[in-house]
């Protein structure tokens, strides 16, 4: 697991339970698909990088960040180049740290 520091907070580059989500078995969360440049611009990518999880080969690694810390306010901006292909799920979500509802969808698409 790779943690990053960005915008004054600590972020995971995978979900809290790990790199692989059994109900989303078409991709896994890959720390190599997350980068921050010298201007603090965050880039999340999707790339072909096969790995095996619990005996199942998954070909696509995706970038994801999830904040370790709780915060209440902030400014978020997205500029997106959406991927083409089958079984892709580009999204920009804000998740609740401890309460319901679990997420706010800023943008979500599924192919």
Language-model regions, residue ranges each:
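GH16 jelly-roll
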Residues: 1-111
């Amino acid at each position: 697991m790779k943690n990053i520091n960005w915008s004054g907070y600590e972020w995971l580059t995978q979900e809290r339970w790990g790199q692989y989500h059994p109900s989303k078995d078409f991709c896994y969360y890959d720390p190599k698909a997350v980068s921050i440049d010298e201007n603090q611009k965050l880039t999340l990518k999707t790339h072909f990088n096969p790995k095996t999880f619990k005996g199942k080969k998954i070909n696509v690694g995706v970038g994801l960040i999830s904040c370790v810390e709780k915060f209440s306010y902030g400014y978020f901006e997205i500029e997106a180049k959406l991927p083409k292909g089958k079984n892709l799920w580009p999204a920009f979500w804000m998740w609740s740290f401890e309460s319901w509802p679990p997420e706010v969808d800023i943008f979500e698409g599924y192919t």
